[in-house]
């Protein structure tokens, strides 16, 4: 069974399948880093609270596989409204992955998943 990459940008959802974990992470990186201005958000107000662009998730990419029933890999990345990217492990309980100095977020994801 292949790895599945799911990209969510607003109401739009796209899914791609990849045979290798390395290819799936590469696809996730390309799709999320090429969003450019579409990922930017302005400060929003809701009732009495204000949400800065860094507090808003403008796009989410999820990686799972190789099986659908009990996938061995569940990870992903959030693109924040200020353009920053945060990678994580898990699906329901997301645990952020620490990015070491001089390391890009997707390099940290590759290191953590062993790809």
Model-derived regions: residue spans:
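A short, exposed loop/beta-hairpin motif centered on an aromatic-Gly-Thr core
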Residues: 11-23
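A short, charged, amphipathic alpha-helix used as a generic interaction element across diverse proteins
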Residues: 20-36
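Short, mixed-charge low-complexity intrinsically disordered segments
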Residues: 37-115
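Short aromatic-glycine-(Arg/Gly/Cys) micro-motifs in beta-strand/loop hairpins
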Residues: 1-13
């Amino acid at each position: 069974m292949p790895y599945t990459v799911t990209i969510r940008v607003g109401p739009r959802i796209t899914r791609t399948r990849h045979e290798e974990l390395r290819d799936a992470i590469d696809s996730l990186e390309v799709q999320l880093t090429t969003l450019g201005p579409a990922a930017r958000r302005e400060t929003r107000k809701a009732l009495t609270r204000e949400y800065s662009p860094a507090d808003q998730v403008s796009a989410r990419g999820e990686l799972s596989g190789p099986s659908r029933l009990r996938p061995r890999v569940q990870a992903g990345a959030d693109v924040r409204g200020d353009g920053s990217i945060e990678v994580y492990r898990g699906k329901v309980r997301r645990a952020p992955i620490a990015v070491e100095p001089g390391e890009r977020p997707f390099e940290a994801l590759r290191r953590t998943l062993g790809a």
